[in-house]
Amino acid sequence: MVEVPSFRSNEHFPQLCDKVTVKWDKKRGRFVEAIEDIPIGTVVCVETGITVNVDPQNCYRCLKITENASFAYCKNCEEFYEPDEIACGEFDELGIFKLAAHLVFSYPFADIASLVQSSDPEPPSCAPKALSTQDIEAIFQLTPFPEIGEAFKAPAIQNAIKRIVESLETDENWGRLDQISRTMTFTKALRIMAERSAKNAHTIYSIEQIESQEDNLPMATGLFPISSIFNHSCTPNISGFFVRNTFIFVSQGVRAREELLDSYGVTYHQHTFEQRTNFLASVSGFICHCESCFKMKSLKVLEKPKKYPETIATNASCFTDITSYTENIPRGSKELENLIIAFARRPDSETYTELIFQFWKKFVENAKFRGITYDPYLVRPYVEMTILAWNKEVGCENEEKMSLLIVTHRLLRNCYVDLHPLSELVVKLVNVVANQNADEINRTLEKLKLRARMLWKYSEQSEDL
C-alpha cells in the first residue's frame, strides 16, 4: 500500500478521511458528504483496490514493475493463491471476466461459498454504518449491470469457467466441493462479481501515462468499491490519481455539508456538452444531470475547434507561422493550449527560450479564462515556466522566479500529495534556492529538465525553424 502521511482515516470508513461521512437518498443512492470544510489539497480517500494487470511488466496483483517480465508476480505477491492460468494471462482476452475471477479469489472462501445458498445481493437502500474494501459487502453494495449475464453463454467464457473449475480440484477449500457444486459456486460468484465490475471498474493509468498524453497500454483494471461511492459531476470538487494499485483523492476545496464529487473522465471546462454526454453514456452508462449539463451545457470556445494544432506545430517552417496563427485563436480556446504543447515537443523550440516562456504564460492565462484556476492540468505549464525562469535569456526577476517556483510546488503538493514524478526534484529545488547555492540550483534544474522531457515525451527528431 502507498503511504500517505497526511491522510487521517475515518473510524467507520477507513479508506475515507475523518472529515466526511457516507449518506444515502433515492436520487443519488450512496454519496459522500463533508461534515466540515475540507481545504484544498486535503487527502479525502486512499484506497488500495483489487486489481489485475493489463501490461505484463506490472505485477499481476499489486502492479509494481516486476524484475522478470515472464513471471506474473513480484516477490511480495508470489504467495497469493490463484489459478496460474489467470495470473499468467491466458484469459486476458475475456476482459472484465479476468478481474471478476480475481475478485472471487480475493475474498474468503466461506464468503464466496455462501453465495450459492442465498439470493443475489441487492443494492443498498440506506446509508451503511461502516464499510471497508476488505469486506466483501463493499462489493455487494455496488450497483450491478445484469445485462452482462448474457455474455456467460459465450463459448469462450464457458471454456474458461470449465478450465478454472478443473484447476481447483486440488485446492484445500474448493476441492472439498464435488464437480457440480464447485462449478455452480464459481459460476455464480463470477457472475455477481462481473455484474458489479462492468460499470464500476476503473482502467488504471499511472501519472506518467496521463502526463504523456499518449495512447499507452493501461497498467491494469481494478475495482475500488469505496472510491466508487463518489458520484460524478462535470464540475468536480475532488480529483484522483493512481499510484500502482492505490487510488488517491484530494480536495479541490469542499464546504461543510457539500457532496464530494469526482469527474469520471470529462469536465465542463475541457469538454463540450456533446462530448461529455456521449462519453458518460458509453463508458459509465448514465446521463449526467449536474448543473453544468442541466443549465450551462457547453463553453462556446470549446464548440468549434478549427484545425489540428499538432499538424500546424509540426509543419510550421518558421516561428512566425506559429505566433501569427495563435493571434487568430479565440481567447479561452483549448486549441491554443494544444498548439503550445505540440510546439514545445519540437526540440528546436528551445532555440526561442524567451518566446516559449511567453507561450506557457499564455497557456495559463488562456486556461484561467476558461475557468481552470487551480487544477492538475496546470502542472505542466508551471513546471515549464519554472525551468525556463532561471535561463539567462528569459531575464526573469528573482521575485517572478520565486513566485513560479512556489506555485509549482503548491500545485504538486495539493494535487498529488508530492507523489508526482517531478515532486521530489521540485521540493529539492525549493530547498537549494532557499540556501542560495548557485551550483546546486543549476544541477537540480538540469535534473528537473531532463526528467520533465522524459515525462512529456519530447521529440528526438529536430527540424530547423
Swiss-Prot record:
Biological process, per Gene Ontology: methylation
Keyword Transferase in annotation: yes
Cited InterPro entries: SET-MYND_domain_protein, SET_dom, SET_dom_sf, SMYD4_SET
Signal peptide interval: none
Coiled-coil segments on the chain, per record: none
Keywords: Methyltransferase, S-adenosyl-L-methionine, Transferase
Domain SET positions: 18-265
Recorded GO MF terms: methyltransferase activity
EC numbers for this chain: 2.1.1.-
Family the UniProt entry places it in: Belongs to the class V-like SAM-binding methyltransferase superfamily.
PANTHER family named among the record's database cross-references: SET AND MYND DOMAIN-CONTAINING PROTEIN 4, SET AND MYND DOMAIN-CONTAINING PROTEIN 4-LIKE PROTEIN
Name the record gives this protein: SET domain-containing protein 3
Source organism (scientific name): Caenorhabditis elegans
Organism phylogeny: Eukaryota, Metazoa, Ecdysozoa, Nematoda, Chromadorea
Gene name in the database record: set-3
